[in-house]
Regions:
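Short solvent-exposed beta->alpha transition segments
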Residues: 18-28, 32-79
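Bacterial signal peptide processing site
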Residues: 12-17
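Bacterial N-terminal signal peptides
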Residues: 2-11
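Surface-exposed, charged secondary-structure patches
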Residues: 57-103, 231-233
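Extracytoplasmic
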Residues: 77-81, 101, 111, 132, ...
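Short beta-strand edge/turn micro-motifs at domain boundaries
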Residues: 94-134
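Juxtacatalytic substrate-recognition/specificity segment
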Residues: 139-262, 353-356
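Acidic/His/Gly-enriched intrinsically disordered linker/tail segments
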Residues: 211-218, 238-239, 257-385
Length: 385
């Protein structure tokens, strides 16, 4: 009986393992053919592997690479579910593959071939832009803008903002970064939340965020600026530019922004570059903090990371951003633009938060944290009272 089982196993999968391996190999081959169709812009070949709508949604995206790695397969007759890792690079922008988890449903066709019936984000992964519909693409001198449910004219407006932001950031920070940005413009707040894999309520009123690869681990081979079109639409022309320049600053400073960097510095520095050259006065750019100072409620300490939580009360959140901006503005006023950049880099060079700010203040600015805080409070009185 054992000999018979061994013989039949080599032919029909006695015990199930050879058959399972065969199915995995067949599905991986299917995904390889589908990936080749994407890269070769071959809609006909893609349609033999999966729904053509999925191909049409992403066909305008300029891709340098696109591949799947099957990690698990669970078959139940003519239907199977699978987990896979999708890796891709946007041509000219991503220096390494973006990798995200995908959950696939497959079915056997009448001729016994596997077919991708659905391809969705894995349980803990955010959506990709093409999961939300057909992607339109506009390329700029320093930017790539991709949107869903947006007119080409509106994407061109974002391109103009991004193309202005990149050289503005380089003028203040320097040129030791990629000097280009990818901007994603979904159709709504819900679309933004889908890309981030978070509840929409977390980003209501937030005009844009910068993240590592959308839906990925956050250890970013490339950053994405993701716009909340609902909040962005209510901004004036200066506000729209400030937001895009702020987010572009996060892209530029990514390599020097570490766990040692407090949010008052990373957000304050991004706002400082964002407002630079706009002509906005402190009372105009920091209205909530200005009201607090004028009411005698002068902050006793620099904003904490907790103060920047999206769940914070709107006024408190605004004061945190404004307080960080005023701290960076003070450094520029008293020590200069170059020293502000050196201070930012010095803080980020530390391995951990403890002592990072204090060490950088002593080495770059020549003051203690206590002295800096008192100078900042005096600066708030002078500028906002």
């Amino acid at each position: 009986m054992l000999a018979l089982c061994l013989l039949l196993g080599s032919l029909v999968g006695c015990g199930g393992q050879p058959a399972a391996n065969s199915a995995k190999a067949a599905v991986q081959s299917l995904l390889d053919r589908q990936s080749a169709a994407v890269l070769h812009h071959d809609g006909t070949a893609y349609a033999r592997t999966g729904a053509r709508t999925a191909y049409e949604n992403l066909s305008a995206v300029p891709l340098a690479s696109w591949s799947y790695r099957l990690t698990s397969l669970h078959r139940a007759g003519a239907i199977a579910t699978a987990d896979a890792q999708l890796s891709y690079r946007v041509k000219g922008y991503d220096t390494a593959p973006v990798t995200v988890g995908r959950a696939l449903t497959l079915r056997l066709t009448a001729d016994g071939q596997w077919y991708v019936a659905s391809d969705k984000p894995a349980k803990k992964s955010g959506q990709q832009l093409w999961d939300q519909g057909k992607v339109s693409v506009v390329k700029g001198a320093h930017s790539l803008v991709m949107g869903v449910g947006r007119s080409v004219d509106s994407l061109r407006d974002f391109r103009a903002l991004a193309d202005h932001a990149v050289p503005a950031v380089s003028a203040a920070w320097g040129t030791d970064w990629t000097r280009h940005v990818v901007v994603l413009v979904p159709g709504s707040l819900d679309g933004m939340a889908g890309l981030l894999g978070s509840p929409a309520a977390s980003y209501r009123g937030i005009a844009a965020v910068t993240t590592g690869e959308a839906g990925g681990s956050g250890s970013a081979p490339a950053d994405r600026i993701i716009v909340n079109p609902d909040a962005y639409a209510v901004l004036g022309s200066v506000g729209k530019q400030v937001v895009l320049t702020h987010e572009t600053t996060h892209v530029a400073t990514r390599a020097h922004t570490t766990p040692a960097t407090p949010l008052w510095l990373s957000e304050g520095y991004a706002d400082w570059i964002g407002y630079r050259g706009t002509g906005r006065t402190p009372t105009q750019a920091a209205p909530e903090l200005s009201r607090a100072v004028q009411d005698g409620d002068l902050p006793t300490a620099l904003p904490t990371d907790k103060d920047f939580g999206f769940s914070s009360e709107a006024t408190e959140l605004a004061r945190a951003y404004e307080g960080g901006w005023m701290a960076c503005r003070m450094i520029q006023d008293r020590w200069g633009v170059d020293q502000l950049g050196k201070f930012y880099r010095a803080v980020g060079s530390h391995q951990k938060r403890a002592g990072a700010v204090e060490g950088a203040m002593k080495n770059v600015l020549g003051v203690t944290l206590e002295e800096f805080t008192e100078q900042w409070r005096d600066y708030l009185r002078a500028q906002l009272a």
